[in-house]
Amino acid sequence: MYTFVAMPFRKTHFLALLTILFAFKGSAQRAFVHTSGPELVDGANHPLMLRGTNLGNWLEPEGYMFHFDGGPQSPREIEDLTTELIGPDKAAEFWQQWRRSYITAGDIDRIKKQGFNSVRVPIHWRLFDSDDAEGFHLLDQLVQWARKDGIYVIIDLHCAPGGQTGTNIDDSNGYPWLFSSQEAQAHTIAIWRRIAGHYKNEPIVLGYDLLNEPIPHYPQLQQFNKDLEPFYRRLAESIRQIDRNHVLILGGAQWDSNFKVFGPPFDSNAMYTFHKYWTAPDASVIREYLEFRDRYHVPIWLGESGENKDEWVAAFTRTLEDNHVGWCFWPYKKMDAKSSPVTFDRPAHWDDIVKFAALKPGTGNAEKRIAARPPAEDIQAAFDDLLNQIRFDREHVNAGYVKALGLTPDAPQ
């Protein structure tokens, strides 16, 4: 029999207990990457310089990476073409296999060996529209691989409900309805709350890139610039009700380039991101972002760049490194290309698919399209070989590109 004996609980004991609890809480918070003034720091409070690659075309296919010049460009357009060519049942099976094969554990191992320390994962809202959605299964697997290799994961909402850009990249209807549709805004908030709830305790997930490249440079759409930061505030407030651990990443208007839409920072754990393509590779193109960092004492990050020659990539990377700006080049992997860390061969009969894809679309042109279809066996062979070519063991390393990033090239495959 146990006898409970009441003991006096002194004030000093209470204070000691509080000290232990707060120390534990602080230790838990420090396990996550977070901001510290103009720097990003890791869980041990050491400065963290991000050197990353974008896993583009995995969960949000883009037409140019299939060489569909003049053809389908958005995910839905590419999926419609696939369905038209191989039918709905085979198309559904194809895309499931695509998502299982395009990025694998071998790829994350290679990314680690090449010297990267982070990946940005562009996602489509449709894959995260329920707690048991396919996207969570795929991303959970990626997080597991990344945790093993010490690769930080940044989740990027590339395709938001309603569309934040109004072009192919957000899979919209050709207009950024997100900024004028209350339903789309509520849906986007719900997507981020679901993601935050799922990953709130996962330290290898570095942060959430809330909207990719909102509002293009088209003059007619710049009316929405004034709505961007208020919507970011709504997203942040909603996410912070669930997850106070992760960095919130905010991109400017006009393809993430215009920081004039921002006032003083409204979240104590936020980083600001910009994208730069086809510019001079010197410090003049990032000066306004450096000034923003100095003015508000917040970290900045290049979330996308690339699609250029090795010489340009090398020069721009040096500029970023010299100015202590973390970076993430686009993309990791492309078909028949030199402007990515790895590439894969063009599938058999793919030129026939590209030629067909360039025809004028729509059921009003069905007769002409049906007449121009490649032979059924060639179509099937092309899509089968595409799944074969994207496999990890069929990829080729672009050593010159990896070297241009200042990283150690992987062994040739």
Please report, for each region that a protein language model flagged, where it lies by residue.
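Active-site mouth of glycoside hydrolases
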Residues: 35-50, 54-247, 252-260
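Extracellular glycoside hydrolase catalytic/binding regions
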Residues: 32-33, 89, 186-335, 339-355
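Aromatic-rich peripheral "rim/lid" segments of glycoside hydrolase catalytic domains that contact
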Residues: 312-413
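A general structural signal for short secondary-structure junctions and capping/turn motifs
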Residues: 4, 9-10, 42-44, 292, ...
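Bacterial Sec-dependent N-terminal signal peptides
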Residues: 1-29
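Short amphipathic alpha-helical segments that mediate assembly, nucleic-acid/protein binding
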Residues: 11-14, 78-79, 91, 379-383, ...
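Alpha-helical transmembrane segments and their juxtamembrane interfaces
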Residues: 21-23, 166, 219, 314
